[in-house]
Amino acid sequence: MRILVCGGSGFIGRALCRNLIAQRHQVNIYTHIHDVTKILKKATFLKNTFGSPNFRLVNLYNEFPNVDVIINLSGESIAKKKLTHKRMDEILSSRLDTLNLLFEEYKLRAPKLFIQASATGIYKDKAQCDETGKLGDNDYAKICKAIEDK
């Protein structure tokens, strides 16, 4: 399969991409990091995949590939910095900006499957963690809800 992973250089994305590449899927990683050496420091497993026809880095300066699946894990890390109101705005906008970009790039050639990662933080404490669970009212829940509403 031809797969675009947004946020493929992040914590979960690195593990996912490693697995997809091992399964011989054609993996495209969209990242906002423009410096390839920085990406390789974060995701050392990618060093062996450069030059492989099954792997490609994509950023704003590349043409987005035709793909069968988009997996969107993108967004600023919640754990990186202190959570202030400004930081929460950055976290939300980083996720919505990527969604808007993907919608624009793929509006005329939608993939068969679009997987959007969210978080269990959308649910109230002790709620059932699926689409039937009650939503929380904290900042994490508001971010998740805004993404899912998009």
Language-model features, listed with the residues they occupy:
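Conserved glycine-rich Rossmann-like NAD(P)H-binding loop of the short-chain dehydrogenase/reductase
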Residues: 26-32
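NAD(P)H-binding glycine-rich loop region in Rossmannoid oxidoreductase-like domains
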Residues: 44-99, 108
